[in-house]
Amino acid sequence: MGLPVAFIKNMREILGEEGLAEYLDSFEKPKFTGLRVNTSKISVEEFLRISPFKLCRVPWTENGFYYTEEDSPTHHPYYYAGLYYIQEPSAMAPAAVLPVERGERVLDLCAAPGGKATELGAKLNHTGLLVANDASASRTKALLKNLEVFGIPNLLVTSEMGDRLDRYFHEYFDKILIDAQCSGEGMFRKQAHMIPAWEKQGPEVFANMQREILRQAAELLKPGGTMLYSTCTFSKLENEGSIDGFLAEHPEFTLEEIPRQEGFCSGMPELVGSRFPLERCVRLFPHKIDGEGHFLALLKKAGEKIPGAPEPAGRPGRIPAELEAFLQDVSMPMELSRIVVKDTRVFLMPEGVGRCPGLRFLRSGLYLGELLKKRFEPSQAFAMALKKEEYASVIDLSAADDRVIRYLKGETLEIEDGESSRPEGWQLVCVDGYPLGWGKLIRGTLRNKYFSGWRMNA
């Protein structure tokens, strides 16, 4: 592989001659593939019990595992049930390091396609608020799908610049993750097409963007809050340089220690002549770990964290009769006062979120479904947010049952007597106890209501 001369020179400065040789040798290593268990749906122990894959734990996260490409986990029904996310192993580190607690307000500022946002949502586990933002509107569609597959209800998906978010969310968030757009040097081993892009638009361009993103994030973080900055590049300008410049302009922030794992290397303040303790940052290199590479910096904002008072729920609005009838079969906890009807579409809004006129939303809350003529049609997102026991009538199929694949392809199914909780009407279709979507049972025939845009081979 032809690496740019300027890149080799930069890596020699970072690694020295011996380290550079080891790094270059890593291009002969196999590329590592990983999956991360969705702990808001299934425990790691239970997943390991039912998993058909050969898995080996990723050291820096409790719910991440290496798998072999022969296993093809993206073709298994458990993937469609949202039990795991496919993610490059070193990219699991940022969300693992950011200490998210249940009930907090969390922002993923550069969230698409959702690898880190899905883990932040799983950590919140149906509590608090997750705002998943990406400035690129075209990338937010994949982001929304991944969050909905994971069954995360307490979310806003936005497409804004950080300064626009600040109009509505100034010093609002307890935790912020910034996985900044970067020159992508950590992807050279895996995606050689990144190299020509690096030659056209190198670290200098991205470093300026990253410092602006950090500045915007600082305004969105509560006093006492914590934010995690990460990149998938090795550049000193984008890593230590960006953090050094930020700390020089923001004395209210300090660098926090990141717990070390085997293969984690310390940041290198000497690369940029910094007076700050940048050795508290972490560098991941492909010749030190089984992964592609990352940089992490954990930053804390001075001040006392004041618990955010949730916005008053207000009076319950009038729930349409069709929706009320459907919800009688649903036992998922929800405040009816947070249900909002927009034209014919019905949403369950997260706690503590007011009106944000002018903000570009792709999704505001959990999309429950649509009011049609004298009936309510539940959404795919609603099914994914439920647990099997939270709906009155269920068809639970084994992963080995060929009807599961047929269901995921959008086909009509024949259901035997006793296979459904009720003989007619809406059914929550599950695989081994985990929801996949909806179906409507009529005289032994299940009309397929799986969302057409998510179908297998769609």
Q: How should these model regions be labeled?
A:
Residues 101-102, 166-179:
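A short acidic, Gly/Pro-enriched loop at the edge of an enzyme's catalytic core
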Residues 173, 226-229, 234-347, 352:
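Class I S-adenosyl-L-methionine
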Residues 103-112:
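Conserved class I S-adenosyl-L-methionine
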Residues 138, 175-216, 232-239, 265-270:
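Mobile active-site "lid"/loop adjacent to the S-adenosyl-L-methionine
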Residues 124-125, 221-223:
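Helix-to-beta-strand junctions that scaffold the AdoMet/dcAdoMet cofactor pocket
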Residues 113-126:
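Conserved SAM-binding loop of SAM-dependent methyltransferases across substrates and taxa
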Residues 133-171:
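S-adenosyl-L-methionine
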